[in-house]
Amino acid sequence: MKIVSWNINGIRATRVGLKETLDSLDADIICLQETKVTRDLLDEPSAIVEGYNSYFSFSRVRSGYSGVATFCKSSTTPQAAEEGLSGVFCNRTGSVGCYGNTEQFLEEELQSLDQEGRAVLTQHRILNCEDKEETLTVINVYCPRADPEKPERKTYKLRFYHLLQTRAEAILQNGGHVIILGDVNTSHRPLDHCDPTDLETFEENPGRQWLNQFLGDPIPSQKGDSETVMPPSAGSGLFYDSFRYFHPTQKNAFTCWCSASGARQTNYGTRIDYILGNRELVESEFLDSVIMPEVEGSDHCPVKAFMKCQPIAANKCPPLCTKYLPEFAGRQQKLLQFLVKKENTLGNTTEESSELTGTPSFTEGADISTVRKRPSDKLNSTSKKKSKIVTKNGQGNLLSFFKPERQKLTMATECNPIEVPICKKEKTVQKDLQPATPAVKYNKPQTAFWKSLLKGPPPPPNCKGHSEPCVLRTVKKAGPNCGRQFYVCARPEGHSSNPQARCNFFLWLTKKAGCED
């Protein structure tokens, strides 16, 4: 069994079709984050993919924001699925359950934590390596980012972490296994960050402190990585970071890079995408956990886990499945109608239509060649005219079929032909359209004058590190320098020890551009 997690940064922005993208990931369960699609914008190609059943969670606060989706192969159809961590928005039928003690959260807070579309749960039946059936719950999450300029988002992020832990541990205590995977938006160790700076400040981050107590010490893998040394802050939680379980000392293993600075070219990033599993599951069923930096299309790369267990498909998709949404279920029902014969319905419809329009109904043995359709404009005639034409038996008067349509003829005779004047002076027109040679000669000194007056921006300076032309940037952040422009090295961002990375050249441009508030 193979599981993949990927922050796709827009499900509708894939370079190829979604099915081709999913197939290329080669996994039984594919969890996507930051789909950036709300329910009203979800189209059928994204919702219903051949060979997969999908489960979405949409943002209810903003359009084109957040959102997660889990795609399961037909051979891995879950037995239950649920949107959100709190159960506020879930349908009790086919839900996962086990919410834990949420008394520390207010009802409004629970609704706020789930209304941004950041979690989808799917529960599967698996056959473990000992051929025993067990339950596996997969929690697909897109954890919030703590914006430094918005202190309330820092609190929101920590509360989301605590709700995630409450739900995951409650499901685990109820039996079975749990996998948490997705964009956690926190790099755990200095090894997971390209520039951890001061280690003391690094460890003081509240998100890292939560991960310390939530995750347990990884046991050295059987591949000989026994030299693993964990910091004293390592916790004794119920879950393992599966990647560090198998690759505890691997450096430069990043999953997210800044697209604006081109940091992916120099691998100057962070590892914030995880596949976390409960201890027993990782120790007994996991074979490996890897990152996939070769897969492009987002500012994140996928992460993948290989497991020994085999999935057991459910007979029917749970109610949360996207194909059951009315906007997509209705389309499938219409397609089914073309494949099912409905003789009685068609018969009644024919009788009703013949009574309403006054046209003769087709009976067995009738000469079809003698029946003619009435013109469409007769359907809009007044009730008085219909009463004269329709007989007591509901059949139309034969004279109505041969009656000349005076109205159409009158309209045709009243239309006057449109006279289009023909230009007979082609030579004169062509002569006027020809460019005037004296004018071109007259404009040459004007062009030289304007070029001398409007010289344009000066060429950019060369950076001191590489002697290459710099690029011009503009300060977007609010403050006294907002709108100011500056020159920096054109190379991608990277570590200071990397000669191929951007040097530290910086030069303000004297002229200040405008900045919107």
Curated annotation (Swiss-Prot):
Keyword Transferase: no
InterPro entries linked to this entry: AP_endonuc_1 (IPR004808), AP_endonuclease_F1_BS (IPR020847), Endo/exonu/phosph_ase_sf (IPR036691), Endo/exonuclease/phosphatase (IPR005135), Znf_GRF (IPR010666)
Residues flagged as site, Important for catalytic activity: D273
Stretch list, region Disordered: 347-366
Subcellular location per the Swiss-Prot or TrEMBL entry: Nucleus; Chromosome; Cytoplasm; Mitochondrion
Keywords in alphabetical order: Chromosome, Cytoplasm, DNA damage, DNA repair, DNA-binding, Endonuclease, Hydrolase, Magnesium, Metal-binding, Mitochondrion, Nuclease, Nucleus, Zinc, Zinc-finger
Co-factor(s): Mg(2+); Mn(2+)
Catalytic reactions on record: Exonucleolytic cleavage in the 3'- to 5'-direction to yield nucleoside 5'-phosphates
Purpose of the protein: Functions as a weak apurinic/apyrimidinic (AP) endodeoxyribonuclease in the DNA base excision repair (BER) pathway of DNA lesions induced by oxidative and alkylating agents. Initiates repair of AP sites in DNA by catalyzing hydrolytic incision of the phosphodiester backbone immediately adjacent to the damage, generating a single-strand break with 5'-deoxyribose phosphate and 3'-hydroxyl ends. Exhibits 3'-5' exonuclease activity on a 3' DNA substrate; nuclease activity is stimulated by interaction with pcna.
Record remark on domains: The PCNA interacting protein (PIP) box mediates interaction with pcna and recruitment of pcna to DNA single-strand breaks.
UniProt record similarity statement: Belongs to the DNA repair enzymes AP/ExoA family.
Name of protein: DNA-(apurinic or apyrimidinic site) endonuclease 2
Organism: Xenopus laevis (African clawed frog)
Taxonomic placement: Eukaryota, Metazoa, Chordata, Craniata, Vertebrata
